[in-house]
Swiss-Prot record, chains A, B:
Keywords: Amino-acid biosynthesis, Cytoplasm, Histidine biosynthesis, Hydrolase, Magnesium, Metal-binding, Zinc. Gene3D superfamilies: 4.10.80.70, Phosphoribosyl-AMP cyclohydrolase. It catalyses: 1-(5-phospho-beta-D-ribosyl)-5'-AMP + H2O = 1-(5-phospho-beta-D-ribosyl)-5-[(5-phospho-beta-D-ribosylamino)methylideneamino]imidazole-4-carboxamide. NCBIfam families: PRK00051.1. Mg(2+) binds at residues 74, 76, 78. The lineage of its organism: Bacteria, Pseudomonadati, Pseudomonadota, Alphaproteobacteria, Hyphomicrobiales. This is Phosphoribosyl-AMP cyclohydrolase. One of its GO terms (cellular component) is cytoplasm. GO terms for biological process: L-histidine biosynthetic process. It comes from Bradyrhizobium sp. (strain BTAi1 / ATCC BAA-1182). One of its GO terms (molecular function) is zinc ion binding. Belongs to the PRA-CH family.
């Protein structure tokens, strides 16, 4: 069966990347056709940055690369799921996962606040990205 | 800390929903402000369907509801991660997860095919949705 990704108007699919060992969601990002091809071809995660409008190999600045254990696609082929071995931390803030804050209900109507969880920094982003 | 979701031009954030027991990604969908509020308020997953342009309680047609164990948001608050207890199957095709096909490399340049994995149907969609 052919892999026929269904790109959105911007030429992108959504990518969910999880830690192959724990199942934790590390990040949500986007891929264009070239990022998909390079990821499949090399076994390393490549993404497309909407803010920088550029193809991007995960870890090319930070060294925090992702080795792909498995790639899957969903029922309508507009999303992919990468199970990876993450070197260090996935988040640009230095946390293991971008999802380091829990949404907790504060009001019966659905009002909520954020609570930090698993939020230790594994690297110092100022040092790593030399900002 | 306030939860300040960063909605896209269509008023949506991306939602990744995983099985709280296994860590498997069940589905990727979208939420608008009202879907977020109802999910937080009720502890059941609500989404916004772009194709139907409608708010949607997961399982309202199929009975395959999702009880939220935890909700998190990511570093830029444009995505949420739901860990859920899934009743039956998450996918409209009757599979447990929408991600029932693996992307496998067939060519060195990144060409790929799809291989079915974990693709048993837990319900018959024709019967459940009465199409």
């Amino acid at each position: 069966m052919a892999f026929l990704p269904k790109f959105d108007a911007g030429g992108l699919v959504t990518c969910v990347t999880t830690d192959a060992a724990t199942g934790d969601v590390l990040m949500v990002a986007h891929m264009n056709d070239e990022a998909l091809r390079r990821t499949v071809a090399t076994g390393e995660a490549w993404y497309f940055s909407r803010s920088r409008n550029a193809l991007w190999r995960k870890g090319e600045s930070s060294g925090q690369t992702q080795r792909v254990i498995e790639m899957r696609t969903d029922c309508d082929q507009d999303a992919v799921w990468l199970r990876v071995e993450q070197t260090g931390a996935a988040c640009h803030t230095g946390r293991r996962s971008c999802f380091y804050r829990r949404v907790e209900r504060t009001e019966a109507d659905g009002g909520a606040r954020l609570v930090f969880v698993d939020a230790d920094r594994l690297f110092d982003p100022d040092a790593v990205y030399r900002k």
